[in-house]
């Protein structure tokens, strides 16, 4: 753990983030500021959290809270940590950790273009095959590269069809348990700028390049002996960043279905992906049957996890340097970027917390890592369920983050007098905020 902790400081120093404990001043606390022993400091944090869980908000809503000290490898605080609750977009942490564990940090999302026969002069007497790899970042430059590959081979006319291989996942367009009135993009392995209009845009680019398609567009699977003409790739880091920083739902589902594809079965389903997550849950020492994994983004109302599970995933990541590096790089930084950009500014939590937010109707969550003032690295999960407004949950979560990062000398501020709440436009909504290419 010491090597990982050293890495954590080095990485943050490279980003010029003030992650060191704040300077100590004369204390107003009962405990001495000179006593930064683990026991004394943990007592102070627990006292702060005890005061928060007794707030009136907890009388009209449900709370799940779990804080783990990674430095001492011990549970620091728990309140309702085994309650099954909807995680909202904190589900993306589970998806990300599982993907980094099973796919690796070098994994790439790949979209390929094939021909069924070798080109002859300027005529392709066979068909083109576009094989989707569920790349949510496939855009204009990628599509242009496919057309360029045809032009470089001198192809001016395609006598066959344009075949779309969408066999990486099943034919359902939306996630299991998604609300019918959510405005979410369809889930398909062949995407163009986050939309399912890949074929239309490809045909448009062919016409602009003076290439004629004589056949039709239809679905198929990749024929044996097909010839690879071009492929475009995006790294898992490129996908994880918008998935976690901006809470991009489509990126999360794309990652989820890469896990499903590990089944090696055509038309894999969400159940195939969930089975991969379940295996990691078992490795973390928990019982998969106690949870419901319905999707990768947290949009589904069928997802049920616990703060204990979320913390177990964070602990697993912290114990695996490669996973930890990729994960923490993609998580929002409190008060700096992503969905945490406007939260806890000018407080001890700013720069000292990296966490994933979550918001659904009646649910608000926050899951991630914090650096305590005594130099201990913590991980935590907070789920507020049954909250009337998003602000209620976020105010509470921000107060917890301040409680975890304040020193002995910092007055504890209750959430009912702390206005540090990001505008709802800064937070993820049920509609994914898809990345757009520049013209």
Mark where each language-model region is.
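Bacterial Sec-dependent N-terminal signal peptides
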Residues: 1-32, 36, 439
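Beta-lactamase-like hydrolase cores
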Residues: 21-71, 77-84, 148-153
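Extracytoplasmic
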Residues: 60-62, 80-82, 88-91, 106-108, ...
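Soluble periplasmic/extracytoplasmic beta-strand elements of cell-envelope proteins
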Residues: 64-68, 76-78, 95, 127-131, ...
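Active-site SXXK
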Residues: 73, 87-106, 162, 201-203, ...
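Active-site-adjacent, His/Asp/Glu-enriched structural segments that form or flank metal-binding
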Residues: 108-169, 178-185
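A small/polar active-site loop signature that marks catalytic segments
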Residues: 192-328
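C-terminal soluble interaction/assembly domains
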Residues: 292, 300-439
């Amino acid at each position: 753990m010491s090597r990982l902790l050293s890495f954590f400081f080095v990485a943050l120093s490279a980003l010029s983030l003030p992650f060191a404990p704040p300077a100590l001043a004369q204390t107003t606390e009962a405990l001495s500021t000179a006593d930064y022993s683990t026991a004394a400091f943990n007592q102070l944090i627990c006292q702060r959290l005890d005061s928060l869980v007794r707030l009136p908000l907890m009388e009209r809503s449900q709370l799940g809270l779990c804080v783990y000290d990674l430095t001492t490898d011990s549970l620091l605080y728990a309140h309702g940590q085994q309650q099954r609750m909807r995680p909202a977009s904190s589900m993306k942490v589970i998806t990300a950790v599982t993907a980094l564990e099973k796919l690796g940090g070098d994994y790439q999302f790949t979209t390929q273009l094939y021909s069924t026969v070798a080109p002859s002069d300027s005529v392709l007497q066979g068909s083109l095959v576009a094989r989707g790899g569920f790349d949510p970042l496939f855009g204009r430059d990628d599509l242009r590269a496919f057309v360029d590959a045809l032009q470089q081979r001198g192809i001016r006319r395609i006598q066959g069809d344009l075949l779309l291989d969408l066999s990486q996942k099943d034919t359902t367009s939306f996630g299991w348990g998604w609300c019918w009135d959510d405005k979410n993009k369809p889930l398909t392995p062949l995407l163009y700028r986050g939309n399912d209009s890949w074929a239309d845009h490809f045909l448009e680019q062919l016409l602009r390049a003076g290439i004629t398609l004589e056949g039709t567009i239809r679905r198929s699977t990749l024929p044996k002996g097909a010839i690879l003409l071009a492929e475009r790739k995006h790294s898992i880091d490129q996908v994880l960043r918008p998935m976690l920083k901006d809470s991009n739902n489509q990126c999360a589902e794309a990652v989820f279905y890469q896990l499903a594809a590990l089944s090696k079965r055509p038309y894999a389903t969400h159940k195939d992906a969930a089975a991969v997550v379940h295996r990691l849950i078992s490795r973390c020492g928990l019982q998969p049957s106690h949870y419901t994994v319905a999707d990768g983004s947290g949009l589904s109302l069928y997802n049920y996890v616990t703060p204990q599970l979320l913390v177990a995933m964070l602990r697993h990541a912290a114990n695996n340097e490669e996973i930890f590096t990729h994960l923490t790089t993609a998580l929002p930084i409190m008060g700096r970027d992503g969905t945490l950009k406007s939260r806890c500014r000018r407080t001890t939590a700013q720069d000292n917390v990296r966490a994933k937010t979550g918001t659904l109707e009646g649910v608000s969550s926050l899951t991630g890592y914090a650096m305590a003032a005594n130099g201990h690295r913590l991980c935590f999960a907070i789920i507020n369920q049954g909250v009337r407004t998003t602000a209620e949950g976020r105010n509470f979560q921000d107060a917890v983050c301040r409680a975890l990062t304040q020193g002995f000398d910092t007055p504890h501020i209750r959430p009912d007098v702390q206005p540090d709440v990001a505008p709802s436009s800064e937070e993820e909504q049920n509609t994914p905020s898809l990345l757009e290419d520049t013209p």
